[in-house]
Amino acid sequence: MINPFQRNLDSLGNYFSYPIIRFITGILLIPHGYGKLEKGWNGNLDGFISFLDKEFSNPLFTGFFLAYLIAFTEFLGGICIAFGFFTRIAAFSVTIFMAFAVLYHLPHGFFWSKEGYEYPLMWGVITFAIFLRGSGEMSIDKRFR
């Protein structure tokens, strides 16, 4: 038999758990994007652009374009995910970016402390789950449905 406290906790958990996960995920993405917009990667925007030119050089996407695409994806995607605005588009965009980050870090092994793919994999799985679930009840998207 479920006691009243457990029933109330289940009800609260069912209502608030997903918005909390979505909000915190978005909030934690924002500084990653903002940091890249402000200073690039490791505090050096020119170095970040040069790194992207060297690693991902192709005629379609320059390092400059990729640097800002990555930064805006994390920054604006984080804001959208946090507040549930264009949630699926934002989460899918971050998921795609993280899939490329996983592929880049794959040769370094699993652990992030050795530049492995652990951290981008975690972000990718969480944002993919958000993409699948959508914005949920407590979101800006819900207000426009």
Where are these regions (language model features)?
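Extended, low-polarity transmembrane helix blocks
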Residues: 1-42, 60-72, 76, 83-145
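Perimembrane loop-to-helix junctions flanking transmembrane segments
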Residues: 44-61
